[in-house]
C-alpha cells in the first residue's frame, strides 16, 4: 500500500468519516509511540519460510493462488494487546504473513499481507463503533458490551490462554473480494491453523469472567515465564524442526451482509477449504532488518482486495480503517526509526554518520540558496594555494562592520567605542554578568579555557576577562582586560594586544558555546525527541514544526565543515579536537529548558540593545504559545492519546539529557509551555542574532582570529584566513524562511507590536523561523 492508495481510500469517504478515520490513525500512532513500537501486536517472534499453493477443485481459480505455485513468506506471531509483554496474560494472539515471490526482499510490501487474529469474528462491525470503543474508558466500554454494540461472543472468542502459538486458529475476520480467472468476484475470508491440530487449543473455561477488557491477568498459580510462547516457538526451530500451517478460505457471493466482520459465516454453508501449505524454518527475531516490517491488510493483490468503504457506518469501513491505520502507523514508526541516537557520550542529536531521515531532506528552495553561496567555500579556493590569489580573494570580500570602525588606521588598532558596543550587541550576546564585590568594575565577560588542552607547541591564555564599569547616568566604560594573571588597562601600551586576545577567546567561545552548543546541538535534542515521540498530527508537533525545519540537515551536512577533523575550528583554533568537543559538552551540561533570558541578563545598561530585545521576544513568545496552541487546542491536548505522547516526549528528554546542574527540570507536561518557548527563542531569535552578526564581528582575519597563526607556515595561514572570511560570509548571508514571510499571522502580529524594541538590534528581515544555517 502506497500513498496514492491511502489517499484514494481516504477520499472515498465522506468528510465526517474522514475526520473519524484520521482520529483513529492518531490514536493508534500515539499508542505505538507510547509503546516505542507497534500500537498493537507489539512484542512477537519473526520467522521465514515458504508457501505452496495446494490443489483443490473447490477453490475458485486465482492469479495469485495458482496450484503448485511457491512463494517466500515472512511470518510473525504476537500477543494482540500492545505492551502486554507477558505471554501468560489471557490475551488475543495474532499472526501476520507477507507473501512474495522467491527471492523478494520481504522487508517491503510485496504480493499480499494477511493479518490474522484469534477469534472467528471481530467484536465491532463498523469503524464508527471501533473509534468509539478505542476512545472510551472502562465504564463506557462496559456499556457498549451491555448494549451489544461490542459483541460479547467475539471478545470471548479472541481471548486465549495457550501453551503454544501453534495450537490456535487465526482469522482475518475481514473479507476480501476474490476475483477469479474469469473475472467473477466473490467474497473470501481466511484462517490459519496447524494441520496436526484437530481442535483449537487455549480455550478459556467458564470460570474466567469476560468483560470489555481485551487482556486479563495471568491465572493464579501460573508460573510460566513471561515469554514462554515466543521461546517455545523459537525452540521448535532451534531443534531443527519446522513449523507447519495450512491457510484456508471460505467463499460466498457478493452481498453487504457478508462484509460484516462481526458475524460468523456458517461453515456448514461456507466450508473452509485448504488454499496453501506454509512451512516455517528460519528464526529472524534477532534480525533488525525485519523488525520494522509494517504488515497491512491494505497491502493486497490486484485480484484480492478489500471492499471499498464510503462511510464509517458501512461494514466495509472496518477493513478500510485497518488499512489506513496500519499505513499511517508504519509511517510514524518508520519516521521514529530514522531518528536514531548515537552513544550518550556523543553530542546530542543524530550522529552525522547515520543516514538523514527522509522527512529532513531540505526543500529545493533551500538547496538553491545553499548552492548559491557554496562556491565561496567549495570551489573558489585556488588549487595552487598561491598566496597572492588568496589575498586578492580575501580582500575582495564585502566590508565588515569592524572594517568600517577601524577605517584606514592600523588594522590592529580597534577603537574602544566599537569594541565596547559589540560586547553589548554583537554576535556573542547576553554574556555580560554582574560581578560581585569588585572594586573598579561592576560587570564582566569571562572566557576560561584552563581545563582544556592546547595543541602541542602552541599557546593560548587559560583565562581572559573583559571588565566593565556600568553607571546608568554616565554609561558603560572599559575598565580592564585580565589575561591569566595580568590586568591590562586602556592606558597601558599592551591595550590593543589585550583587546585582540579577548576577541580571539570570544570568537572561539561564540562558535563553540553559543552558536553550536547552545543553538545547534542543544535544540537538536528537542527536535529528535519531538519527531520520535509526537505523531505528525499531534497539536504540539504541528505548532512547533516550522521552528524545527532544517536543523537536522544542517547539523548533518554543514556543521562537520566547522568542527569536523578537517573543519575550520580544529584547524584555526589552538584547542585540540577532543577539547573542542569537551567545550561544547560542558556548555550543554549547563543548559535546561527551564530557563528564561529575563533573569539571566543585566538590566538598564546604556547602549544595550540585546537585553530589551531578548526580553520583548520572550514576552511575546508567552502569548504566541498560549494563543497559538494551549488555548485553541486545550481539549485536544487533554485527550489520553495526546497526553501519552507528551509524557513520552518528556521521558525521552530526561533519558537523553546532558544537564548536570543542581536544578533539573521535572520533565513532565506541566513544563510544556516553558519547553516550547525555549525551543522557539533559541531557534528563531537567539540564533538569528548570533548567526547573522558573525561576518561583521569576525569576518576579517586581519582583525579577529582564533589564535596566533605566526607559528604556522604561510600556506596554512592562508587557508585559515580564507576559510574564516568565506565561512562567516556564507553563515551570515543565507536567509531562509524569515518570520516576516513564513511566520503565522499570530506570530507576525506579536512581532510587529514589539518591533520598536526588536529592530534596533535585529532587523526583522533577519529574524528567521528556525536554525537552518
From Swiss-Prot:
Organism in which the protein naturally occurs: Nostoc sp. (strain PCC 7120 / SAG 25.82 / UTEX 2576)
Protein name as annotated: Linolenate 9R-lipoxygenase
Keyword Cytoplasm: no
Residues annotated to bind Fe cation: 515, 520, 773
General function of this protein: Catalyzes the conversion of alpha-linoleate to (9R,10E,12Z,15Z)-9-hydroperoxyoctadeca-10,12,15-trienoate in oxylipin biosynthesis. Also converts alpha-linoleate to (9R,10E,12Z)-9-hydroperoxyoctadeca-10,12-dienoate.
Pfam families for this protein: Lipoxygenase
PROSITE patterns for this protein: LIPOXYGENASE_3
Organism domain of life: Bacteria
A single GO BP: oxylipin biosynthetic process
Record SUPFAM superfamilies: Heme-dependent catalase-like (SSF56634), Lipoxigenase (SSF48484)
Chemical reaction(s) catalysed: (9Z,12Z,15Z)-octadecatrienoate + O2 = (9R,10E,12Z,15Z)-9-hydroperoxyoctadeca-10,12,15-trienoate
pH behavior: Optimum pH is 7-10.
PANTHER family in alphabetical order: LIPOXYGENASE
Domain Lipoxygenase: 176-773
Keywords per UniProt: Fatty acid biosynthesis, Fatty acid metabolism, Iron, Lipid biosynthesis, Lipid metabolism, Metal-binding, Oxidoreductase, Oxylipin biosynthesis, Plasmid
